Amino acid sequence: RVVVPFNISCGHCYFCNEQLYSQCETTRDRGKLAEAASLLGRGKGASLFGYTHVYGAVPGGQAEYLRVPQAHFGPVKVPEEAEGAPDERFLYLSDVLPTSWQAVAYADVPEDGTLGIWGLGPIGQMSARIAYHLGAGRVIGVDNVPERLTLAAKYGVETVDFSAVDDVKELVLEMTGGRGVDAAIDAVGMEASGSLIDSLLQTTKVQLDKAYALRQCIASIRRGGTLSISGVYAGPIQMFPLGDLFDMQIQVRQGQANVRRWVDDIMPLLNDDDPLGTEDLKTHEMPLEDAPLGYEIFQKKQDGAIKCVLKA
């Protein structure tokens, strides 16, 4: 058994040698579309499976068969001693686990420090567990989906239902002695993009508007703290408080996960003890032909969907 990372990297170019596998020079799409998609005209990073023509137009992995470019380097072999272990224990090595590990590593939470997580989907859930594993003393998680809040609380997260409070920032400051969290992770993902409709949804507290969530993250971090962004931003964000970041000396780290960089850290934890609870993340399992249903219930947050696993 092998696990295929979501980004495609060669393993030998300049950026791969720097362990920045999501920036692989060999697989980067240098076409006009990728260049046009960059506000700075610098194009995009490494090709990604199933991520449109902007990232290489490589077909995605939700299929019966998958062609794997750069297969000499990318696929991660499941250890032979893990024979008989369920696929789900290793499945998340393709994206969820390394993305979460990188988010926590970039957050640079002090020993026994406090981490805030905005968005308790799969990345937020796993980030909380990894943060505790790596020595965080306290994790505060923000969302409004009951099933997400319940699952996070099971793993020791102090949860905040943003639909039930007037001002998340003020509550987080109150919970942290007025200073704010040592670090925050924006794991909201591509749920909103700051449009008028999204703003209305945020105003009515139906969902967490992405730009608003980012500002709440920043406003809830202590001076000298760190913001780690794992939620994907496809373009400019309105009202980005750069001046406040400068004044508060908040460091910002972000980017697509460099999957292979973190595999050696994660693999020893995928044992029968399952300290990260990888087998507890899946809420739905369905055949491949039901993928549209899986996407729908996840996008609409129906039927308690947190993570849907498709089986061919």
What are these language model-derived features?
Residues 3-6, 231:
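Conserved "cap/hinge" positions at secondary-structure junctions
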